[in-house]
Amino acid sequence: MVLTLLLIICLALEVRSENEEGRLIEKLLGDYDKRIIPAKTLDHIIDVTLKLTLTNLISLNEKEEALTTNVWIEIQWNDYRLSWNTSEYEGIDLVRIPSELLWLPDVVLENNVDGQFEVAYYANVLVYNDGSMYWLPPAIYRSTCPIAVTYFPFDWQNCSLVFRSQTYNAHEVNLQLSAEEGEAVEWIHIDPEDFTENGEWTIRHRPAKKNYNWQLTKDDTDFQEIIFFLIIQRKPLFYIINIIAPCVLISSLVVLVYFLPAQAGGQKCTLSISVLLAQTIFLFLIAQKVPETSLNVPLIGKYLIFVMFVSMLIVMNCVIVLNVSLRTPNTHSLSEKIKHLFLGFLPKYLGMQLEPSEETPEKPQPRRRSSFGIMIKAEEYILKKPRSELMFEEQKDRHGLKRVNKMTSDIDIGTTVDLYKDLANFAPEIKSCVEACNFIAKSTKEQNDSGSENENWVLIGKVIDKACFWIALLLFSIGTLAIFLTGHFNQVPEFPFPGDPRKYVP
């Protein structure tokens, strides 16, 4: 019985309370016109305070230069028409009224990119008995954010959210930053429990300030604005693993062409051009990520262009080395200055030990010379003489010649005289045989000399190849370090505004 009585009393009080709140709302909205600004006089200015709470930095689209954020925007103002005496309504000092029924300061995001100026959801407005209005609607904003691509992917960006009154000027509405404990909240508020960390960007500074456009007058709606800044720094680990590291490793392969023989110019060019094509693909991937701007070139783009230039130089070097290595005495003459420079001077500083073949006669290197060239020379000589004069075996038998080492000791004087007569008669044939032998010996010597000079050209090609290897290695290493260290030293400033020693943090 007692419980039933208590339940009836509670229900009666709740119904009475609901009736009182309903009566209050009916009284407040009875003669209320939401189209009229709540100004007591013509010169009365409505103070509108703003506070931005960031819950999620969703993304930054570099290609479209658009920042997407999830925020709660806190707007406060005073509407004298919505005030009441709490004693007349059983102590009710707060009511919740749908925002569609009230006058709202039309504060919108000015620098949006999708045409959505308004909030995502029109929540109820908290109305206090003194006329104070508190509105906290959620919003997902896509605002413009000019991208500085110079140090991509070691960059930081300065994005902003600009809020203005769409129709009211400074004589009617005064935009201000929210205040707590008598101090302006000059920063974007972040609740650590509700904030979701972004995997690509880190928030370094989040100041807020009111800005005046002194080129205009207070009669212009663009004269005053509230700007919330987001200075964010990129986390480069993703790009280091997926773009920079593969690019550096592939680009370093171009230096390996110098470990191939100097005469393997075709294989060297093939490897260099393959690396060049791979770098072109990486450059295409970078172009798909950064905005299409001609103001700056991204850091990774500079590096790719640099290594492409180095690869092109290496291809040119391979062609030059191949041209030098295949030179012969018939096409090029090897001067003593060139021989001294490339076979005597440079090898000392390149760590090479070369000994030109003609400069070391005391230690002749074993050669494997083909007899085919000698046979060709002999045939050339045979073609110059009648065949009958060179067939010594038949002439020996036909004229009664005998080998001296087979002659016995019983040769008489007459035989000796006949022998001298026969030798005198056959002197031209013997002379021709000697000339043939001399011709073959001369041809063999010329072939050996030609082979020695060919070998010197090959050695010169090796020296050029080794010198270009060290040049390419130094150029590649220094260029890589210089370019990426430039990005490493691109740090976010300690203070958000130059010349202002405040960090704008709570």
UniProtKB/Swiss-Prot annotation:
Which UniProt key words apply to this protein?
A: Cell membrane, Disulfide bond, Glycoprotein, Ion channel, Ion transport, Ligand-gated ion channel, Membrane, Phosphoprotein, Postsynaptic cell membrane, Receptor, Signal, Synapse, Transmembrane, Transmembrane helix, Transport
The entry's localization annotation reads: Postsynaptic cell membrane; Cell membrane
Matches recorded under PROSITE patterns: NEUROTR_ION_CHANNEL
Q: How is it modified after translation?
A: Seems not to be glycosylated on Asn-158.
Query: How does the record describe its quaternary structure?
Result: Pentamer of two alpha chains, and one each of the beta, delta, and gamma chains.
InterPro entries, per the entry: Neur_chan_lig-bd, Neur_chan_lig-bd_sf, Neur_channel, Neuro-gated_channel_TM_sf, Neuro_actylchol_rec, Neurotrans-gated_channel_TM, Neurotransmitter_ion_chnl_CS, Nicotinic_acetylcholine_rcpt
- Could you list the residue ranges that cross the membrane? 236-260, 269-287, 303-324, 467-490
- Which residue ranges are assigned to the Extracellular compartment in the record's topology? 18-235
Q: Which domain of life is it from?
A: Eukaryota
Q: Which reaction does it catalyse?
A: K(+)(in) = K(+)(out); Na(+)(in) = Na(+)(out)
Q: Which GO terms describe its molecular function?
A: acetylcholine-gated monoatomic cation-selective channel activity; transmembrane signaling receptor activity; transmitter-gated monoatomic ion channel activity involved in regulation of postsynaptic membrane potential
Name this protein carries in UniProt: Acetylcholine receptor subunit gamma
**Gene from which this protein is expressed:** CHRNG
Organism per entry: Tetronarce californica (Pacific electric ray)
The chain residues annotated with the modification Phosphotyrosine are: 381
Q: Which residues are glycosylated?
A: 85
UniProt lists the family membership as follows: Belongs to the ligand-gated ion channel (TC 1.A.9) family. Acetylcholine receptor (TC 1.A.9.1) subfamily. Gamma/CHRNG sub-subfamily.
Q: Name one GO cellular component term.
A: postsynaptic membrane
Q: What does this protein do?
A: After binding acetylcholine, the AChR responds by an extensive change in conformation that affects all subunits and leads to opening of an ion-conducting channel across the plasma membrane.
Q: Which residues lie on this side of the membrane: Cytoplasmic?
A: 325-466
How is this protein situated with respect to the membrane?
Answer: Multi-pass membrane protein
Disulfide pairs here are 145-159
Q: Where is the signal peptide?
A: 1-17
